[in-house]
Amino acid sequence: AWGDVKARKKIVFNETMNAMNHGTASAVASTPMMSHNMSNMSMENGMHSMMSSNSSTQGQASSDLPPSMMTGMFTIDNKVFDMKRIDLTSRVGEVEEWEIQNASHMDHPFHLHGTQFEVIRKQWQGKTETASFRALKDVVNLRPNETVWIRTKQNHAGLRMYHCHILEHENLGMMGSLKVIGV
């Protein structure tokens, strides 16, 4: 009962992993969003403060990084999240089909804010499977090298986020912004 699809979107989860952190905390801390210093956090400046590139600790070594932390980036469409950028645009009331591809070696649960969606089909290891039971969701897991198609509709104008629902991946850049435009 979604109606005709009016727009199609495609996003790709990517990751660029380097060597494990063996004494390279300064390299990790100099990567955007990696120092994890939340001293400037407050309810008023929240996410903007945390993701701001002018953090006073950027480029400094962080002694609280776990020794197993990998350096690299978690991205969507080969881009690290930037609050100043709009990645996708949708229109209120339009039915959309999104193709979400996981081009990485680990699972990434996709989460879309502000609405729900139905999984239409999945493709993994050369097999395409149409969803036999469709229910409204706001998260769907993508296995390594899996593609999932969802159908959704935004009912309210405004800014939304979509991201990997593993907090560490989201914080390391695997997030995008969706601007929903009213009619």
Task: Tell what function each PLM region has.
Residues 1-3, 33, 173-183:
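Extracytoplasmic/periplasmic copper-protein system
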Residues 1-137, 141-149, 166:
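Edge beta-strand plus adjacent loop/short-helix module at the start
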Residues 93, 145, 158, 173-176:
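Glycine-centered flexibility sites
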Residues 104-108, 158, 172:
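Short loop/turn segments at connectors of secondary-structure elements within structured domains
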Residues 150-155:
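Short, hydrophobic beta-strand segments
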